[in-house]
Every structure is written in structure tokens, then in C-alpha cells.
């Protein structure tokens, strides 16, 4: 199988787990991260002909150059996963403007830029995109107003794009995780939060990755938001 999957934010967390599953299925991976050395380690661990690329998704020129390099060395991108994201928890009245902007640029603008760049080849051949959102973007949370805005915006963007490009055989979906064991949740006390999760625990990155891969490969699903949260949305 020579289809190419680009995973932005693929060097760690959910993105890394997605890359592992897609590699096992025989796809060629482009592991994209702001830290090239970490991306190279991840690509090397996958084995085979997988490559690492450096990109700051908030910078349009970076994104465009990265897609050019991926196409040059791997071929046209068939699957795109946007898993790069940051969070700066704070009550709105205490949130620095620069923290709002950085979250908007990485979590929302970054995915918009990568999707736009992917369209250049996907319009000709079709493709599948999964943007990693968050249950916070659907339900909101105290101290995460800016983060919630970026992830909620990602849902609106993804659904609109799905309508725009469906006739070109391009599918766009969102996976919205709840509390998942990643670097972003490392500081949280699981014992405190899991009592509100019907399944009684935080999720694993691989569990979210299975949902991402399902949407990537499902030929008749587009514009969908798949919640992977252990039932958390039932209680909030």
C-alpha cells in the first residue's frame, strides 16, 4: 500500500498513536512536529519508509513548504490528521491576550492552513481528513474559555469544509476526546475527575487513535463529530 498519511502533531500523544496504527496498516507516514528531532525518533520507531518533517502550523509558509516537501519525498497526501494542539488553562479575566492568540493560531488556524494546503492535491484525487477536537469544544469548561473556542471553532470549520468538498470525494470529520492520558492532562488528578466519567477512568491515546483511523477509512462518513470520552458528555 503506497497511500500517504500526514499526521501533524504526530510525534507524541494522540497523533503518535494514530501514526502507529496507520503504519501497521501499511500506509506511509509523514510525522510532522515543531520539534524535528522528536519527529525523527517517532518516524524511526515506526520502521519502513516513514519520514519526519518540521512545521509550525501557525505559519502559512511553513505549512505550504511542508506539503511541498511531503509530496516531493512521499507523494500526494491521501490522509490528513490534525492532532497538533496546545492549552493554556486560565479564567478569562486572567488570560493573557498572547495566550488566547497562540491557542487560536495552533488549534484552529493551524488546522485551517493544513486543510487548505491539502486541498491542492486532494481536489484531484480525493482524500480524508480528521481534525482532533475536544469534548471541551462541545460542552465548555471553567478556565478553558479560549481553548473551548478553538475546539468549538474547529467543529464548525470541519463541518463547513465537509460540505464544500464532498463532491470532490474529500471527507472531513472530527474526533472529540474527553480526558485522555497525555502530556496535556499529566497535571490532572485522575482520582478527582474519573468519578464523573461513566466508564470510570481516563482514556488511552490508542483508544482515540482507533476512532481517528475508523473515520479516515470510512468511505460514507463526512461532517461527523465522534466523541471519545468514556461517557463524560452524559454527565456534564
From Swiss-Prot:
This is 3-oxoacyl-[acyl-carrier-protein] reductase. InterPro entries: NAD(P)-bd_dom_sf, Sc_DH/Rdtase_CS, SDR_fam. GO terms for biological process: daunorubicin metabolic process; doxorubicin metabolic process; fatty acid biosynthetic process; protein heterotetramerization; protein homotetramerization. The modification N6-acetyllysine is found at residues 40, 96, 194. GO terms for cellular component: mitochondrial matrix; mitochondrion; oxidoreductase complex. Its EC number is 1.1.1.100, 1.6.5.10. Pfam families: adh_short_C2. Pathway: Lipid metabolism; fatty acid biosynthesis.
